[in-house]
Amino acid sequence: MTNLSDIIEKETGKQLVIQESILMLPEEVEEVIGNKPESDILVHTAYDESTDENVMLLTSDAPEYKPWALVIQDSNGENKIKML
């Protein structure tokens, strides 16, 4: 299995612990980030206390966990999106 924390570290340069993972439907993902995936997406969320940011790694569902996008949400609720 892909180590999801390693992907977050590679993309952000920070070692963060994933706190929760939730399943989202393609339509729900499209509403949030504007791009629609081909299948359901798992959203793995970590919190960066030093910057007060939520870091969300979006991957395909099990068993692949293929990285799809990284979303960093600042304390104002603004999203920075990087497609992977």
From Swiss-Prot:
InterPro entries linked to this entry: Phage_PBS2_Ugi, Ugi
Top-level taxon in the UniProt lineage: Viruses
SUPFAM superfamilies according to UniProt: Uracil-DNA glycosylase inhibitor protein (SSF54441)
Reported function: This protein binds specifically and reversibly to the host uracil-DNA glycosylase, preventing removal of uracil residues from PBS2 DNA by the host uracil-excision repair system.
Name of the featured protein: Uracil-DNA glycosylase inhibitor
Organism name: Bacillus phage PBS2
